[in-house]
């Protein structure tokens, strides 16, 4: 009887140990499988992100190259040389010319040039011709009539006589004694002319007048 009880206890313990071992082995196998799955998922995610980033970089480079080629073609069509077109596309300064109308971008191969520096040209308006009355020549013309000539002469003489009373200068314009030149180290200036007569604030000769 005792042997049977001991045998049952031993069998139960052995079964429990065997079940625990089997469970531990199964859990270890599941953990290893889960680890391999996570590692494969991480590897696939990294490869996917790398491929997508590569495609995005390629698409961005292709779009940039297309835009630069379009700008280059437009500059070439506008008359710029290939060197100036390349500089303009890269953002570098291009060749410029200076004439009486200002600074311009050199475009030697341009098909049309104007005298204006990028300004809008006024639309020419049609001029209505004025009808002129034909005048006869000689003394029969009213412009050469003796009375007209006499009145013109008298009016001119009167205008000249009236101008004689007008002074050619301001009454105090010639009363300046002396003015310190710009290169002088002296700061003294003497003048009997009020500052309101001349606008000397922006004249180089009077630069030291108010020092």
UniProtKB/Swiss-Prot annotation:
Subcellular location: Virion; Host cytoplasm
Top-level taxon of origin: Viruses
InterPro entries recorded: VP2
Disulphide-bridged cysteine pairs: none
GO CC, alphabetical: host cell cytoplasm; viral capsid, decoration
Short name of one Pfam family: RNA_capsid
UniProt keyword list: Capsid decoration protein, Capsid protein, Host cytoplasm, Virion
Principal cellular location given in the protein's record: virion
Chain's role: Minor structural protein that forms a portal-like structure at a unique three-fold axis of symmetry, following binding to the host receptor. The channel formed by VP2 may allow the delivery of the viral genome through the host endosomal membrane.
Subunit structure: Homooligomer. The portal-like structure consists in 12 copies of VP2. Interacts with capsid protein VP1.
Something else known: Translated by a ribosomal termination-reinitiation process from the bicistronic mRNA coding for VP1 and VP2.
Protein family according to the UniProt entry: Belongs to the norovirus VP2 family.
Notes concerning its domains: The N-terminus domain points away from the virion surface.
Protein name per UniProt: Minor capsid protein VP2
Organism: Southampton virus (strain GI/Human/United Kingdom/Southampton/1991)
Taxonomy of the source species: Viruses, Riboviria, Orthornavirae, Pisuviricota, Pisoniviricetes
């Amino acid at each position: 009887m005792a042997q049977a009880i001991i045998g049952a206890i031993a069998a139960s313990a052995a079964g429990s140990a065997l079940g625990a071992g089997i469970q531990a082995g199964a859990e270890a196998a599941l953990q290893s499988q889960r680890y391999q799955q996570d590692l494969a998922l991480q590897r696939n995610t990294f490869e996917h992100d790398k491929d997508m980033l590569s495609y995005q970089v390629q698409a961005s480079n292709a779009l940039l190259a297309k835009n630069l080629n379009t700008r280059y073609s437009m500059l070439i069509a506008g008359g710029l040389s290939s060197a100036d077109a390349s500089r303009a596309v890269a953002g570098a300064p291009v060749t410029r010319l200076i004439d009486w109308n200002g600074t311009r971008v050199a475009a030697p191969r341009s098909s049309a040039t104007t005298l204006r520096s990028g300004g809008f040209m006024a639309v020419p308006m049609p001029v209505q011709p004025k009808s002129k009355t034909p005048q006869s020549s000689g003394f029969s013309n009213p412009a050469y009539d003796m009375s007209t000539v006499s009145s013109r002469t008298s009016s001119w003489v009167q205008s000249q006589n009236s101008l004689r009373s007008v002074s050619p200068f301001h009454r105090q314009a010639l009363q300046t004694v002396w003015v310190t030149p710009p290169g002088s180290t002296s700061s003294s200036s003497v003048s009997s002319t009020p500052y309101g007569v001349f606008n000397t604030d922006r004249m180089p000769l009077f630069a030291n007048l108010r020092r």
